[in-house]
Swiss-Prot record:
InterPro entries: FAD-bd, FAD/NAD-bd_sf, FAD_aromatic-hydroxylase. Its EC number is 1.-.-.-. Pathway: Mycotoxin biosynthesis. The keyword Membrane does not apply. This is Monooxygenase CTB7. Monooxygenase; part of the gene cluster that mediates the biosynthesis of cercosporin, a light-activated, non-host-selective toxin. The perylenequinone chromophore of cercosporin absorbs light energy to attain an electronically-activated triplet state and produces active oxygen species such as the hydroxyl radical, superoxide, hydrogen peroxide or singlet oxygen upon reaction with oxygen molecules. These reactive oxygen species cause damage to various cellular components including lipids, proteins and nucleic acids. Belongs to the aromatic-ring hydroxylase family. KMO subfamily. Keywords: FAD, Flavoprotein, Monooxygenase, Oxidoreductase.
Length: 419
């Protein structure tokens, strides 16, 4: 076993954790990745945009990722009968923005995770421990100790990285409780996502979005180029306390029952298909959309990366991009200053804080969810009319509703540990 001064624990085996592990290993650290799930079948479609694409090139993974994209060719709004109201908006390029939500690199989270995990696990100084959680953390002057659930014994590390998402255990174990409480910024947007069977008579490579009043929407998108499955999203914009309570503490059965009641009345081919698919899905997940905002991304020898430290929420489309960029910079700064982690973590924050803050801005001054999911039939008519205008005129190519327009200069690091 390596001495604790070159041994790092990364909690979370998703994209943020796997990319962090990859670059830390390249920097000469011995990395242990703990992932609480034995498997994680669920996950939404995610985008890789801007400078994150440069990082996947550095990892040698660009072609594999491109080969695994969903094949989505654009997005269209459909009427109450499920018919397109106008031609679809096409894909957006990696650099620059359009009004399309479909990015050039659109991939399911589970597929992207597997690619990143495979790359990290291929390195000799990375170990993944599945079905394992971090139960206790104790900080010391020159090390940090964690008790891991698979052994129940304390283990020493030079640092612990929380790459464990919105409900980060590392954030809860190492940051002040009041700071933790204030870090969570909830919205009134809720989403359930799951897989449903494809319908060759109706489906195309284009995502389809249908609206109903009271802030409801159903979005169905390709999962892969085969077309045998689709990803389905049931979206609600509401200040309903019932939704908030069920999202927070309800069982999966409670959540499905509430969504069944809210979405069953959808007309056309999407409503019945979505609700029936929800009940049979084995990858169902329901959540309230929140952002995480902190004034510092580290506490002692514990640091946060990705959603654990600065989730921008799916409303911005920047979560995966921030996770990849954050992982690269965090690992790079640690490799540059392995004996002065306070300096490394402070530099990590200084380099990315402005970029993260601007990337967390929800479009239209935070009003995007209300505009995208109207409360009234009149609002839906206005949205569909607007969609027709930007589709038929091609104006959508000149607009930007969520692509990466905020730029960041990434340092070049000498990852000399492994070639």
């Amino acid at each position: 076993m390596a001495s604790s001064n070159r041994r790092v624990l990364v909690n979370g085996g998703g994209p943020a954790g796997a990319v962090t592990a990859f670059w830390l290993a390249k920097g000469g650290f011995e990395v242990v990745v703990t992932e609480r799930s034995m498997s994680r079948p669920y996950g939404q479609g995610v985008d890789v945009t801007g400078r994150a694409s440069d990082i996947i090139k550095k990892m040698g993974l660009e072609q594999r990722i491109r080969d695994s994209t969903t094949g989505e060719a654009g997005l269209t709004v459909v009427d109450d009968q499920g018919e397109d109201v106008a031609p679809p908006l096409g894909t957006a390029p990696i650099e620059g923005g359009t009004a399309s939500v479909t990015q050039e690199i659109e991939i399911m989270r589970r597929d992207l995770t597997k690619i990143f995990v495979d790359a990290a696990e291929a390195l000799p100084n990375v170990t993944f421990r599945y079905g394992c959680t971090v139960d206790e953390v104790q900080q010391h002057e020159k090390s940090i100790t964690a008790v891991l659930s698979d052994t129940g014994k304390p283990e020493d590390f030079t640092a612990i990285i929380g790459a464990d998402g919105l409900g980060s255990a590392i954030r809860k174990l190492t940051f002040d409780p009041e700071i933790n409480r204030r870090s969570v910024s909830p919205t009134n947007t809720y989403v359930a996502f799951f897989s449903i069977p494809g319908d060759p008579k109706y489906d195309t490579p284009v995502g389809k979005l249908q609206h109903a009043n009271k802030g409801r929407g159903i979005l169905v998108r390709p999962i892969d180029k085969k077309g045998t499955q689709r990803s389905c999203y049931l979206m609600s914009q509401s200040d309903s306390q019932e939704l908030a309570q069920v999202a927070r503490t309800g069982s999966q059965e409670d959540q499905k029952a509430l969504l069944d009641n809210r979405f069953r009345e959808f007309t056309g081919p999407l409503g019945k298909r979505a609700v029936e698919g929800m009940h049979s899905a084995d990858d169902f997940y329901f959540t309230r959309i929140v952002q995480i905002k902190l004034d510092s991304w580290h506490s002692g020898r514990a640091a946060l990366v990705g959603d654990a430290g600065y989730s921008p929420s799916p409303l911005t489309g920047q979560g995966t991009t921030l996770a990849i960029i954050g992982a690269y910079v965090l690992a790079g700064e640690m490799a540059k200053s392995p004996d002065d982690l306070e300096r490394a973590f402070t530099s990590y924050y200084a380099i990315l804080n402005k970029f993260v803050s601007e990337s967390q801005e929800i479009p239209f001054g935070g009003q995007a969810p209300k505009l995208i999911l109207p409360q009234s039939d009149w609002g839906i008519w206005l949205l569909r009319t607007f969609y027709k205008i930007i589709s038929w005129t091609g104006i959508w190519r000149l607009l930007n509703f969520g692509n990466e327009t905020v730029k960041v200069e990434l340092p070049e690091y000498d990852f000399g540990g492994l070639d």
